[in-house]
Amino acid sequence: MPAGRRYGRTRRATLYVTKEGGGRPVAKRVLMAMSGGVDSSVAAALLVEQGYEVIGVTMNTWTDDIPEEIQMNQHSGCCSLAAVEDARSVAHKLGIPYYVMNFQGQFARTVIDYFIEEYTRGRTPNPCIACNRYVKFSAFLEKAKQLECDYVATGHYAVIGQDDRFPGRWLLGKSADARKDQTYVLHNLTQEALAHTLFPVGHLQKSEVRALAAKYGFVTADKPDSQEICFVYDNDYGRFLKERAPEAIVPGPILNTRGEVIGQHQGLPLYTIGQRKGLGLTTPRPVYVVDLDVERNAVIVGEDEETYRGGLVASDLNWIAIPGLTFPRRCRAKIRRMAPEAECTIYPIGEDAVRVEFDRPQRAITPGQAVVFYDGDWVLGGGTIERAIN
């Protein structure tokens, strides 16, 4: 694929795969984040083929409390010893230097502590978004600058471009593989980060990535995608929260939407909006969590239709395709990574908040999750959901 091409349905932009174009000086040294998975393995190989000087790095972010047998499991997350060995194997095959760098302190402060705090506030966080914001495209980027690297690169499924109308404004676009697109968890990348980041596999289908890995003979070619949050190795959030913040796990009442007590919950952080399973209730019809009342330490449940809301308020905004929002704007929004995009109008509220009104009510709008706004294939920006509104 050429360094730049036209891309997108509603915004004229030039897509950069290598960033060796658009009047930019050719830059050669890249700090490549290698998780030990197939995507970052192929990303590193593509950069080597394109002539970059690639330095492979695995970020050690979390190994506390993870049993040795889990760390040695090749199907465990990116912090496992098996993942490090897989990344080292790929780097050796490519003939590039490889290091393991310790980011545990930064990760604990900005991801683990945030994860726990949000749950104790009755919210449902997305730790991958926090990790991208504060670790991969902040602390890791700073490390790259210290090593005199021009770029960082990852195996994320997304693309980077420049707006043809506003030279110098970097854009974040959807990947070629819609099922693997990761723009939702990348929406808070700054212009500085986008200008110094490469996503080498963003223009490929996942099947193409696996085929390339097999062609290169990588041990990661058939490795399954990581599903769990890296620091919750067994995917049991409840266990993790009980161990890390036992004082926040306080039983309380389950109320219906009329305010009647119909059961007892085991601790507010163990529940999320839209949840049906694990409520321990016997009711004539299925009920779902429709709200978490922190002040009363109560879980509010109702029927499925009561989980729908017509809008939301979001704050902590990061705009990418535009410098800011000063007037109402039509766009599409996504309230969860796997949720479909929904038509909406966004209205500014001061400098760092918006009100979002959906054309059709959306199910399980969840405080703490991100809402990301799209203009065709490109990310306008996004923020954190504060509350749902009718």
Curated annotation (Swiss-Prot):
Annotated GO biological process: tRNA wobble position uridine thiolation
Molecular function per GO: ATP binding; tRNA binding; tRNA-uridine 2-sulfurtransferase activity
Keywords tagged on the record: ATP-binding, Cytoplasm, Disulfide bond, Nucleotide-binding, RNA-binding, Transferase, tRNA processing, tRNA-binding
Compartment(s) where it occurs, according to its Swiss-Prot or TrEMBL record: Cytoplasm
Recorded superkingdom: Bacteria
Annotated active site: C131 (nucleophile), C230 (cysteine persulfide intermediate)
E.C. number: 2.8.1.13
Broad enzyme group: transferase
Disulfide bonds: C131-C230
Catalytically driven reaction(s): S-sulfanyl-L-cysteinyl-[protein] + uridine(34) in tRNA + AH2 + ATP = 2-thiouridine(34) in tRNA + L-cysteinyl-[protein] + A + AMP + diphosphate + H(+)
CDD domains, sorted: MnmA_TRMU-like
Gene Ontology cellular component list: cytoplasm
Alphabetized HAMAP family for the sequence: tRNA_thiouridyl_MnmA (MF_00144)
Similarity-based family: Belongs to the MnmA/TRMU family.
Protein's job: Catalyzes the 2-thiolation of uridine at the wobble position (U34) of tRNA, leading to the formation of s(2)U34.
UniProt protein name: tRNA-specific 2-thiouridylase MnmA
Lineage: Bacteria, Bacillati, Bacillota, Clostridia, Eubacteriales
Gene of this entry: mnmA
